[in-house]
């Protein structure tokens, strides 16, 4: 497979493990497979996690074999993440990156503390092999606590887009890979994505990011996704 899920297959096979691949996402089939095959690791996007949380069979399914549930590719509501920890277990780990560079940050299992959910809105801490900077439009690092674009340098960064020199030059402005994700960093170095750069709304002189609104909406337990 061509996306980041493929990076998990060789290491599993090299350790003598088995890989179960479904043709599509069927929540009941996923739950049944985890229980029957004693699956230890799976990779899901937040929408899939939300669907599993809403499935009537979840609480009757034996998920005790599951040691690691990796999620990524989109933000996850902190409210739903807390629900996942309570109902699925302390197995969540977030990896952030993109096809042009992966992984860039990790929010480890130990960071998913349901008694201290302050990091649930974070996309993690930079992995050891990458250098991350939050840059403004001029390619300068923003002051601590302010929002800037996540930019990266490291061995896992692509060289170029195939036969697309103009796009390559644009995405590597100022010598950094520009992810298009806007974020701020806390004093420990954890990054908090506020939204995609192109999704920012300027209204009344303020920058409004849809994700901030969505996270507030999903604090209502009657709302599954926003």
What are these regions (language model features)?
Residues 1-2:
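Conserved AMP-binding
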Residues 9, 14-17, 31, 39-44, ...:
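Gly/Ser/Thr-rich phosphate-binding loop
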Residues 17-37, 46-48, 208-213:
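ATP-dependent adenylate-forming carboxylate-activation enzymes
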Residues 20, 142-143, 186, 192:
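Generic structural signal for well-ordered beta-strand positions
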Residues 23, 37, 56, 221-224:
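Structural motif
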Residues 26, 48-49, 76, 157:
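Alpha-helix capping/helix-boundary segments
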Residues 34, 42-45, 154, 159-160, ...:
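AMP-binding/adenylate-forming catalytic core of the ANL superfamily
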Residues 75, 107, 114-163, 171-174, ...:
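Adenylate-forming AMP-binding core of the ANL superfamily, especially NRPS adenylation
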């Amino acid at each position: 497979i061509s996306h980041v899920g493929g990076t998990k297959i060789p290491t599993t096979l090299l350790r003598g493990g088995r890989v179960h691949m479904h043709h599509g996402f069927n929540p009941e089939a996923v739950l049944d497979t985890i229980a029957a095959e004693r699956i230890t690791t799976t990779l899901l996007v937040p929408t899939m996690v939300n669907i599993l949380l809403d499935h009537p069979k979840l609480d009757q399914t034996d998920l005790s074999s599951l040691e690691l549930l990796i999620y990524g590719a989109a933000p996850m509501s902190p409210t739903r993440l807390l629900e996942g920890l309570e109902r699925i277990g302390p197995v969540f780990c977030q990896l952030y990156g993109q096809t042009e560079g992966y992984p860039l940050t990790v929010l480890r299992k130990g960071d998913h503390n349901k008694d201290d959910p302050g990091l649930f809105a974070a996309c993690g801490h930079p992995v050891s092999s990458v250098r991350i900077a939050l840059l403004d439009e001029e390619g300068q690092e923003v002051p601590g606590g302010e929002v800037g674009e996540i930019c990266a340098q490291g061995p896992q960064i692509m060289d170029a887009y195939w036969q697309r020199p103009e796009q390559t030059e644009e995405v590597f402005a100022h010598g950094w890979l520009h992810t298009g994700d806007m974020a701020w960093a806390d004093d420990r170095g954890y990054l908090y994505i506020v939204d995609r750069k192109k999704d920012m709304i300027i209204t009344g002189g303020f920058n409004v990011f849809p994700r901030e609104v969505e996270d507030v909406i999903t604090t209502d337990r009657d709302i599954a996704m926003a």
